[in-house]
Amino acid sequence: MRLFGTDGVRGKAGEFLDSFLAMRLAMAAGIYFKDKSITNNILVGKDTRRSGYMIENAIVSGLTSIGYNVIQIGPMPTPAIAFLTEDMRCDAGIMISASHNPYYDNGIKFFDAHGNKLSEDIEKKIEEIYFDDKLIQASKVDMEKIGQAKRIDDVIGRYIVSIKNSFPKDLTLKSLRVVLDVAHGAAYKVAPTVFKELGAEVIVMSDKPNGLNINENCGALHPVNLAAEVKRLRADVGFAFDGDADRLVVVDEKGEVANGDSLLGVLALYLKEQGKLQSSVVATIMSNGALKEFLNKHGIELDTCNVGDKYVLEKLKANGGNFGGEQSGHIIFSDYAKTGDGLIAALQFSALMLSKKKSASSILGQVKPYPQLLINLKIAEKKDLDKIKGLKELKKDLENKNINTLFRYSGTENLIRLLLEARDIKLLEKEMKNVVEFFKKALNG
């Protein structure tokens, strides 16, 4: 049985992800990290879901039972956990979040001592420990060796300083009116503070978390309300974050929601013009064909990888690169962060606007994405795609019609993601109906 998906362990809180699983998983991870322990401290943060308290207590119980000390820092963005794990010299960091998912889901993500997400090999080792009853039992310590847990509430300042240091020293946000949608999530304190301290006029939306409203009709997955507010308030730009603030969606001054690949393209060019872009840009296999065309036109190479910001980071390391991301809004500036950081991306786009003295719409309009259709189809089972009868023929037929395809299963849900891309939207709509019917029969039979 696999516990880890594309981004940690995730599922419905209280059902799949209950206190027993969380405690045992924490013990398994702690056993793994003990071999490389330097400080015997593990950092634990969370987003604003009500179930986070249950899972946090279970994780603390699991870690202290095998002798680890735990530092609890409360609601903080996922990239803050990555940064603070290394900054506070902890052996590992744990983030309790289901990112953009609804409140009833939750998840557990791990970071190593350097703030990096774990490789699949390490995740498999932790899973092996999880299912090894003898090892779990043998790792429990005597009473006098049980670890301690302490809560620290003032570490937010360290993260804010690191975020502000990513913004050019010769610029100020004083001329910008910015609307922030913080999704009732982990950035509800951090994001407004950063933008205000850098001088922006800030209007904040969805900043009253109650444990049940995270991502609900707000944030990066639902930018419609932000778009309306940007227009109504005549703001220069709007930024929407998801529940754990590792992704960003930009809304221009006209209330138009920017395509994630357009954002990647213009930020890559901005880095190149400053002489800061190293090696090729990395995007995922879901990236729009127009991104590659735009980058190549400006002498920038594009490499692709599997979906997931940890795969983007792995490819960047392999290539010696420092910039990449996903169409969904995970954008990695590896000079400043070890994972996707919505706040850093928002500040870099603000710096681009200010340095060019141009509007958000004119900057983003440089990349004109090809039409894409993406459907998340609920399915009964996940069959091996290579063994589905007729799929090769279907893909060949679409290819002959100049339609690019990508079919992949969700790593966390019973869904298949169906992506079609072409220059003709009517053709896409027609062919998508056929594709949906094909997979309904193949995977719900």
Curated annotation (Swiss-Prot):
Its cofactor is Mg(2+). It catalyses: alpha-D-glucosamine 1-phosphate = D-glucosamine 6-phosphate. It comes from the Bacteria. Mg(2+) binds at S99, D242, D244, D246. It holds the Pfam family PGM_PMM_III. Its EC number is 5.4.2.10. Catalyzes the conversion of glucosamine-6-phosphate to glucosamine-1-phosphate. This is Phosphoglucosamine mutase. It comes from Campylobacter jejuni (strain RM1221). The lineage of its organism: Bacteria, Pseudomonadati, Campylobacterota, Epsilonproteobacteria, Campylobacterales. The gene is glmM.
